[in-house]
From Swiss-Prot:
This is Dual-action ribosomal maturation protein DarP. Keywords: Cytoplasm, Ribosome biogenesis, RNA-binding, rRNA-binding. SUPFAM superfamilies: PSPTO4464-like. InterPro entries: DarP (IPR006839), DarP_sf (IPR023153). PANTHER family: UPF0307 PROTEIN YJGA. It comes from Vibrio vulnificus (strain YJ016). Belongs to the DarP family. It is found in: Cytoplasm. GO terms for cellular component: cytosol. GO terms for molecular function: ribosome binding; rRNA binding.
């Protein structure tokens, strides 16, 4: 019988967390899939990730390989990733995906604005000038009239595209100005 101040021999001193073999395999597969996503990235983007040199070299090798060698290299990347913390890597990857979806949303917003300019004319142009004070009202009116005429004459939508390019430039300028203002503060 154990004494009062001692633990019984059948009571473990530390609490063990038992992980099933299938759960370990799922975790390893998830790391390998994360590695596959890293292999698909461009080297310039990959350089910004918080990964070790060994993993970076393995990813660069996998980008060169084809077929079976690539599959084996991806398994090796999964093995190397087991020694690294996947959280910051996943966070950086999510940030890149989010940035892409934000850019797509901005482009859709600009396309909608272009449609309004062509269809509604001056009222939509007034909204654009309110959003972007640097906008050239006269040039936008001229392009809106030209886009309408091109559409009626079944000509290529040159003015239509130019409106979009102007809106995109105005948006880019507004974003860069806001970034500069944040840096000054």
């Amino acid at each position: 019988m154990a004494r009062k101040n001692q633990k019984a021999p059948w009571e473990p001193e530390e609490e063990y967390i038992l992980v099933s073999k299938s759960e370990m395999k799922r975790d390893m597969d998830a790391l390998q899939k994360l590695g596959e996503e890293l292999v698909e990235l461009k080297p310039s983007v990959l350089a910004k990730f918080p990964i070790s040199e060994e993993l970076l070299d393995a990813i660069k090798d996998a980008q060169r390989f084809k077929n079976e060698a690539r599959r084996r290299q991806l398994q090796y990347i999964g093995k190397v990733m087991r020694q690294e913390d996947p959280e910051p890597i996943q966070a950086a990857l999510d940030k890149i995906r989010n940035k892409h979806s934000q850019n797509t949303a901005v482009l859709h917003k600009l396309e909608t604005l272009r449609e309004r300019i062509v269809e509604q004319g001056d009222s939509a142009i007034d909204d654009v000038v309110a959003l972007y004070p640097d906008a050239d009202r006269q040039r936008l009116r001229q392009l809106a009239r030209m886009a309408t005429k091109e559409k009626q004459a079944n000509k290529p939508p040159k003015a239509y595209r130019e409106i979009f390019q102007i809106l995109k430039q105005l948006n880019d300028d507004a974003v860069s100005d806001s970034i500069e203002n944040e840096l000054k503060q």
